[in-house]
Every structure is written in structure tokens, then in C-alpha cells.
Design a protein with these regions (language model features):
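Short, solvent-exposed amphipathic alpha-helical segments in soluble enzyme
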Residues: 185, 339-343, 369
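A beta-strand-loop signature enriched in Asp, Gly, Thr, and Trp
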Residues: 346, 351-396
Length: 473
């Protein structure tokens, strides 16, 4: 028995060493590498299991993803080139070029933009546009629930499929894990093409569970699109039994829908291995009344660059007057936290709004030390108290804004597939600013919250320990 015991320890030690070498060779951010090292060293056995399920890299998918991205960019690139008299204003040129150089995200002019700040406004508009569809409906969502709202959306899609409209739905297999398969089978049986994104089935489970499609995109007839923070579930309208829900979503009409279409079709190729590039999915541009300049930007763990994260850093470092941000989860990467500190210490009015109470306690504990650190540099921290604020937005200098699915955390910037719309338009920026200032009225300043400022030693120690694991949360 003694020999068996020692043999087991030797084998386990070899596995740990091999795994740690693999973590090092991945060449990730030092914080993430160190977090996995700590897990492997100080959580025996369970640490190995956690790494197998959540720690493996996505390099294998990168090549196929890049090929699909290149192919599906060609159509929207043609439309981009055809834009007449198109000249990006100087103040937006550097960030627009950043996104174009990273993954060929293209800016488009002549867009009409409508912003929704609650599910009560967004979902009736979505259903209305679904009802108008004549050619196709494309939906990409993290969560679609088998609840009253989910069934209403499903019924609307089934009705359009029966009318001959092409309906395609992508849902995230982890985000929608509570939704029974019968819900999706009913749609499939009625002619809707439905795919789960990266299904978590053995043996693929271990390599895929950590990389999720967090995007919330809808494209209708290639003319109207939606993007933002709301999934398809009742709580995005009514909230939860504990608290109400605050969120932000956007309706786009105009050429920027090409960007949404490209994002969906890249995901569609990934799940179905079917290329869709026909002209009918990129119809003639409908000129929006607002004439807004919009750039739809995606990011993913398969990308060479963290596109949206680098965009946020660029905005923070370029800001001259203010940057206002809303996020439900604040576990910033080093570049984001550094940029926030530098901006605030340079005299820029940097404000960060997070929920007073999150829906995940571990994330709340981990975020507190980041919040205090940002606050010490002069970032004004606001805690939203009128329910749970799930909104993901940023506005800067009355000049530009972004709304989408991206949280200010490691998961969104590094592990998840995300999508944001960037608006280079003073009118839209002022709208987003007004939304932020309205939310600020329902918030309290961090300095007024005793539990954040004066904490016992053991609590501070615990929060600092959990912070070490923030790259994994």
C-alpha cells in the first residue's frame, strides 16, 4: 500500500508539472498565468479538473475562425468601398483605424439609431420588426429561456418560418443550459435552423466550456439590426423576485447592419460550416434619418488581438474631458485598470457605475479591491441601487459612445465572443450621456457606503485572495 501511495504522488506530481509547463507555454497575460499556477499548486486534484474544464486555450479554432472572417468580410468590404463621399472625421480616425486594422471592422455612415433602456421598450420593437420580416431573420443570443417571453419570441419566429422567411438562431449552450431541448426541437420541427454554440458534450466539453458566445445580435432582412446587453428571457423585462432590471440595447437601421450581419454569419459558419455570402443578405443601403457613423466591432478568444479591450484603452487614453462607464461586473484587466488610473490622474472625469449588489457574490468580492484601487486614483465610483444594472455602455467627451455585450472584466475581454457598436456621433453620445446621468440619480457614491470603505482585516484579506482568481471568474 505504501508503494501505491508513493506511486500515486509521483504520477500526480508529473501531471502537475506537465500542466504547469503547458500553462507557461500558452504565453497568456501574467495575471492569468499566475492565477492558474496558484490553482494548480494550492487546490490539489480539483485544480487539475478546473484547468481541464476551464483553462485550455483556443488556438485550434483560430485558423478556421480567421478564414471565415476573411471570406465573410469581402461582401461588407465591397459595400464599404461603395460609400460615396465618405471621409472619417479626424477626431475618430485613430480609433476607427484601430478596429479596421485589428479585424476589418468597418465604419458605415447614414445610420438611424434608437436606444432602449428597458426590456419593456426593446422587446415590443424586436417583435414588431420580426413581424415585418420578408427574407430572413438572424438571431445570436447568449440566453434564450423557455419562459413566457422566450415562448412569445419562438412563436413569432415559427410564424415567419411558416410564411417562407429564412430563420436562423444561434444560442449559447452554457448560457441556455436551463432551456430544455424540446424548446429548440419545436422550432427545428417548424423549419427554423437552430444551432447551439460550442455544445458542451464530452469529450469536447473540456476544451469548449470556458469560451462562450456572449453576443446579443439580431438582423432582419439585412436592413434592421439590434445589439446590446439584453438576452431573451423574462427577467430582462420584469427583473427577478429580488430586484428590478436595468439594461441597454440599440436598434440600427442603415449600413451598419452589414457589420451585424457579418458578425452573425461568421458565427453561423462556425456552428454550421455553411458559408452565406449572397447579395440578398446585404441589400441596398437604407439611409437612416440620423446620419450617424457606426462601427460594429467583435472580439473573441480566437482573435489575434483583444479588439474591444484595446478600443476601451484607446478611448480612455485619448479622453480630454470625461469618460463615463457602466458595467454589471468590474474585474478589469491590467491594461484597462492602468488606462483608467492614468486618465483619472490626468484630470479626466472618469466615472464607473456598477450595481450596488451583483447577482454573483464571488464576483462582487473579487471586484471590491479593484474598485478601491480605481477610486484611490480619482475614478468616481457609483453604485446603482434601483435594481440590477446589467447595462454595458461607455461615453466620452460628448463625441463618441459604445453599447454592446462587453463587460469590463477578464471574461468578456479574453474568453467570450462579444460584440459592441461604436458610435462616432455627438447626438448619440449626448443621448448615452443623458442615460448615464439619469442612472447616476439612482446611484450612491462609493464614499457613502461604509461596507466598502471600512472593512475588517479578514474581509480585506479574503477579497484580496479572491482577486487573484479574477482572471478565472
Amino acid at each position: 500500500m505504501i508503494y501505491v501511495h508513493w506511486l500515486f504522488l509521483v504520477v500526480y506530481s508529473i501531471i502537475i508539472i506537465i500542466t504547469m509547463v503547458r500553462v507557461l507555454m500558452d504565453n497568456r497575460q501574467p495575471a492569468k498565468t499566475m492565477a492558474w499556477m496558484l490553482v494548480l499548486m494550492f487546490i490539489p486534484f480539483l485544480g487539475i479538473i478546473l484547468y481541464i474544464f476551464f483553462g485550455q486555450n483556443t488556438r485550434k479554432e483560430r485558423k478556421i475562425w480567421q478564414q471565415s472572417l476573411d471570406q465573410l468580410t469581402k461582401r461588407s468590404m465591397l459595400e464599404f468601398v461603395e460609400q460615396k463621399d465618405f471621409n472619417i472625421p479626424e477626431e475618430y480616425r485613430t480609433i476607427s483605424n484601430l478596429f479596421m486594422n485589428q479585424n476589418l471592422a468597418l465604419p458605415f455612415k447614414n445610420n438611424e439609431v434608437e436606444i432602449y433602456t428597458s426590456g419593456y421598450d426593446f422587446f415590443p420593437s424586436l417583435l414588431m420588426e420580426i413581424g415585418k420580416a420578408e427574407h430572413h431573420i438572424h438571431i445570436d443570443t447568449f440566453i434564450i429561456s423557455d419562459d413566457p417571453l422566450g415562448r412569445i419570441i419562438a412563436d413569432a419566429l415559427i410564424d415567419k418560418a411558416k410564411q417562407g422567411v429564412e430563420v436562423r438562431l444561434i444560442y449559447d449552450d452554457v448560457g441556455s443550459w436551463r432551456t430544455p431541448n424540446s424548446f429548440f426541437m419545436r422550432m427545428r420541427n417548424e423549419g427554423i435552423e437552430v444551432y447551439a454554440f460550442m455544445p458542451v458534450r464530452f469529450p469536447a466539453f473540456t476544451s469548449r466550456v470556458n469560451y462562450r458566445n456572449h453576443r446579443k445580435i439580431c438582423v432582419i432582412d439585412g436592413e434592421v439590426g439590434f445589439i446590446g446587453g439584453m438576452n431573451i428571457a423574462r427577467r430582462y423585462v420584469q427583473g427577478t423576485p429580488k430586484q428590478s432590471w436595468r439594461d441597454t440595447h440599440v436598434k440600427l437601421t442603415g449600413a451598419a447592419v452589414y457589420g451585424l450581419q457579418r458578425a452573425f454569419l461568421v458565427d453561423w459558419y462556425f456552428v454550421s460550416k455553411v458559408f452565406i455570402t449572397e447579395r440578398s443578405y446585404y441589400p441596398e443601403i437604407i439611409i437612416g434619418q440620423n446620419n450617424s457613423l457606426v462601427q460594429v466591432v467583435t472580439s473573441s478568444p480566437t482573435s489575434l488581438w483583444p479588439e474591444i479591450e484595446q478600443g476601451y484603452v484607446r478611448i480612455l487614453t485619448n479622453a480630454k474631458h470625461y469618460v463615463y462607464m457602466e458595467t454589471p461586473y468590474f474585474l478589469p484587466t491590467d491594461p484597462i485598470l492602468f488606462a483608467m488610473r492614468v486618465a483619472a490622474l490626468s484630470g479626466v472625469d472618469v466615472r464607473l457605475m456598477i450595481p450596488y449588489e451583483t447577482d454573483t457574490k464571488v464576483v462582487e468580492w473579487a471586484s471590491r479591491s479593484y474598485v478601491i484601487e480605481a477610486s484611490k486614483a480619482g475614478v468616481k465610483i457609483l453604485l446603482y441601487r434601483k435594481g440590477f444594472n446589467h447595462s454595458k455602455l461607455l461615453v466620452s467627451d460628448d463625441a463618441m459612445a459604445t453599447i454592446g455585450s462587453t463587460n469590463v472584466d477578464f471574461r468578456s475581454f479574453e474568453n467570450d465572443f462579444e460584440a459592441n457598436a461604436f458610435f462616432y456621433d455627438k447626438k448619440i453620445a449626448l443621448q448615452v450621456k443623458e442615460i448615464f446621468l439619469a442612472d447616476q440619480k439612482d446611484s450612491i457614491d462609493l464614499d457613502d457606503v461604509r461596507r466598502f470603505i471600512k472593512k475588517p482585516f479578514l474581509q480585506r484579506l479574503w477579497e484580496s485572495f479572491v482577486r487573484l482568481l479574477s482572471p478565472l471568474l
